[in-house]
Amino acid sequence: MTISRRALLAAAPAAALTGAPASSRPTQDPAARPAKPAATPKTRFAANVEMWWGGLPFLDRIQKAHELGFPAIEFWPWRGKDLAAIAKKTKELGMTVAQFTGWGFSPGLNEAKNHVAFVAEIEASCKAAKQLDCTRMTVVGGNDVQGMTQAQMHEQIIAGLKLAAPIAEREGVMLILEPMNIRVDHKGHCLYGSEAAVRICRAVGSPMVKINWDLYHCHISEGDLCGHLHDGFDQLGYVQLADHPGRTEPGTGEIHYPRVLQELHALGYRGFVGVECNPSKPEADAALGLWHADQW
């Protein structure tokens, strides 16, 4: 008897429902859900506690991160926060402050007139880092300056970082320069994509001035995440992630994070990966995206 392809395909769904043994059907095994989904075997994730559990008091967010298995946290500006309480809480829980923001968007590092203030703030931020036992702080380049070309602004970023590099080297706190994206989140920012950030950090030439390699921003700005990581890995100081579109947790968008994290691991990165994303669902469920991203 001859069976047509159309008949075979039409019969297949019914056979799958009625004829397949029960043992071959997918099941929801409660035991397969990890109790601490952020305690992943290969990647060390740091919860961004500005974006996760935002409605809770700050110390409670750290506690929640610990309960999900995060070994570390990160946050934005340190000013206005109780650093002594944060240091005490993370120490009690055996957690690390992976990084925080030491210099933000304004005033811009891309203008020479701001460099004295920048150096002073890096000095103060290093003291904050020491209090938190933290070894990295993010530095932002700044928004576009009227009358300056992008090349001129980048030259000023280099000049400012060269002034601050001796402080970072003396204190053992790495300055991590973060390129943004200008298509979705930061229109008018002067530094986007990894290639420009790599050029800047190579020009500075300090082992304590590297890149905060935000995979979400770089995906939007330039794509080819694995290729760019390979080309600029010598300047990578820290990694952050989120999926796109939506800036939510891995598994909700178009970035295949298992492959990207595998590439990072193959290149030799063993530092923390900051989870700077908005959970699309309750945090305990969103953290499952991290668990799955770590499976390769």
Regions found by a protein language model. Give the residues of each.
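Active-site acidic/histidine proton-transfer and metal-coordination neighborhood
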Residues: 12-17, 37-39, 79, 108-210, ...
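Glycine-rich, proline-tolerant flexible connector loops at the mouths of alpha/beta enzymes
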Residues: 75-91
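Histidine-acidic metal/acid-base catalytic patches
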Residues: 2-46, 51, 55-67, 133-135, ...
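Active-site-proximal loop/turn and secondary-structure-junction residues that shape catalytic pockets
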Residues: 51-53, 79, 103-106, 143-145, ...
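Catalytic domains of carbohydrate-active enzymes, especially glycoside hydrolases
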Residues: 61-79
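Anion (oxyanion) recognition and catalysis
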Residues: 66, 91, 130, 169, ...
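Mid-chain, structured segments of secreted extracytoplasmic proteins
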Residues: 90-117
